[in-house]
Amino acid sequence: MVLLSSLLFLLGFLTWSPSASWAAKVIVVPPIMFESHLYIFKTLATALHQEGHETHFLISEGREVPPSPHYHLQRYPGIFNSSTADSFLQSKVSNIFSGRLTFLELFDILDHYSQNCDAVVGSVEVMTRLKEAKFDLLLVDPNEMCGFVLAHILGVQYAVFSTGLWYPAEVGAPAPLSYVPEFNSLLTDRMSLIQRITNTAVYLVQRFGVHYIALPKYDRIMKKHGVKPQAAMADLVQGSRLWMLCTDMALEFPRPTLPHVVYIGGILTKPPSPLPQDFEAWVNDTAEHGFVVVSFGAGVKYLSHDIAYKLAGALARLPQRVVWR
């Protein structure tokens, strides 16, 4: 709760002005898939509501989001509904686990994100409605980079709220490649000379992908719809006033960061609930070695038989008991 209170203070500082009241009108642009991200934003919306702020979610038509007094829904005609988004995501996860090149799947996901962004920006009715709402702050999930575009079009301040993904090189954070492993490099902070060369190669490939494949998709969307004033997507990514990463330094390798990058892991923690009696007895019986909880989150619902069998075999070798959610 201390972390959540600090987060609310930071958001309040962003939206405060001498001529405005403390209550702010916030719009959140969650990704078109990954329901776990939406769960985090709902928790944030509840906390904002309790402090007197008003939160809106920009959600596609057909996406199942239960109503709540803590937030409002702004609907738009997107390319996915809840069922098709989940089917698409699980197919990507299955392909990755089957050995298909990860970056091919990521590019396909990116292509669907940009298609959806094109539909939103191109909807006169949706954009007019959002402009008339006069929001004070827009929260961007960096998985859904359209949030940067929408913040620019609406002319509102924006901050990034991420489950861990960010773009340190694009934001301006130093990345000494000798000890800062690149995302998806499968390296640690202790690298041999060959591994450092590999890390540098991964860094260059990813910078190429971001600057010449990912960001230009959104530049073309803004050019297509005549967005004024003109702005480069790279400048919009770098222009965020605050990056909030829902992870913890304990889970990261040491690396340089920036003053406006804040680690806020743990904001979803809450007092424990009592265990069912039979399960509590099972836990108490593990006093010697303890137990391990295995969970892949909401993004991974199905594992292939081969991978599940290998994981089960590895877990069976542990002295601890295992709870597989």
Where are the model-predicted features located?
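Long, low-complexity segments enriched in small/aliphatic residues
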Residues: 236-253
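Short, solvent-exposed loop/turn positions at domain surfaces
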Residues: 230-231
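Glycosyltransferase specificity loop/lid
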Residues: 2-226, 235, 251, 260-273, ...
